């Protein structure tokens, strides 16, 4: 939590008033430098927070996803090749997270990571680690987070590098598993609405991006 506050403080410092005096600017620059140093040290000390993501506490896992998102946005230089090899399977394969209370922060991390580091997809077994878990996630109705997860599906599709997946088979599997998740017995009106809206947006997105998935 302290590290997360440090990261957020660093973001605030970036947005300080441009009319600040030179003394204030020097002070703020020093604070920012110290903030980045602390963030880098914490990232290394806690081994990319991989162990924390395995916590039995959903609150801790959710906070860790948020923390990683802050790092990706504001301290991206800590994600070197070795770090990417360790983190890519964990972040892109995070769909085995079954606690719906974690899904909002989980999605933020996945989307920001995939957009910021498209090369990350080359550091993991896409079909075994990412897609198999993603298909299970969809089949199980997003483990109870339909209203959170369905609106993010188009963003996820858009973030996947075209070369990372097999076109025709990927689209078929995606729609098949998405529909399977829709056929659950208990589906609220809000869940049904979220599904219908998401399905429409997905269909339109696929039409607009058909060249990414050659048939």
Please provide the spans of the model-predicted regions.
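Extended hydrophobic, helix-prone interaction segments
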Residues: 1-36, 45, 49-64, 68-73, ...
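Hydrophobic residues within the alpha-helices of tandem HEAT/HEAT-like
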Residues: 4-12, 53, 64-75, 95, ...
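HEAT/HEAT-like alpha-solenoid repeats
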Residues: 17-50, 78-95, 121-138, 166-181, ...
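Long amphipathic alpha-helical scaffold regions
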Residues: 35-36, 49-52, 57-59, 88-92, ...
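Short coil turns that connect the paired helices of HEAT/ARM alpha-solenoid repeats
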Residues: 54-56, 96-98, 140-144, 181-186
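Positions within the helices of HEAT/ARM-like alpha-solenoid repeats
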Residues: 59-61, 98-103, 145-149, 187-195
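Long internal repeat-built scaffold domains in very large eukaryotic proteins
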Residues: 153, 160-163, 167, 171-215
């Amino acid at each position: 939590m302290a590290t997360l506050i440090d990261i957020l403080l660093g973001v605030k410092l970036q947005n300080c008033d441009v009319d600040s005096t030179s003394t204030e600017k020097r002070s703020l620059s020093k604070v920012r430098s110290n903030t980045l140093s602390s963030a880098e040290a914490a990232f290394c000390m806690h081994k990319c927070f991989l162990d924390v993501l395995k916590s039995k506490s959903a609150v801790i896992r959710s906070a860790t996803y948020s923390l990683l998102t802050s790092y990706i946005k504001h301290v991206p230089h800590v994600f070197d090749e070795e770090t990417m090899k360790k983190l890519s399977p964990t972040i892109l394969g995070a769909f085995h997270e079954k606690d719906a209370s974690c899904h909002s922060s989980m999605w933020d991390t996945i989307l920001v990571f995939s957009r910021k580091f498209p090369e990350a997809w080359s550091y993991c077994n896409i079909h075994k680690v990412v897609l198999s878990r993603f298909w299970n996630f969809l089949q199980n109705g997003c483990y109870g987070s339909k209203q959170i997860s369905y609106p993010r599906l188009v963003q996820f599709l858009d973030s996947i590098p075209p070369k990372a997946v097999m076109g025709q088979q990927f689209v078929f599997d995606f729609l098949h598993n998405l529909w399977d998740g829709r056929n659950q017995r208990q589906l609220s009106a809000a869940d049904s609405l979220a599904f219908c809206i998401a399905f429409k947006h997905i269909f339109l997105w696929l039409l607009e991006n058909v060249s990414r998935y050659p048939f």
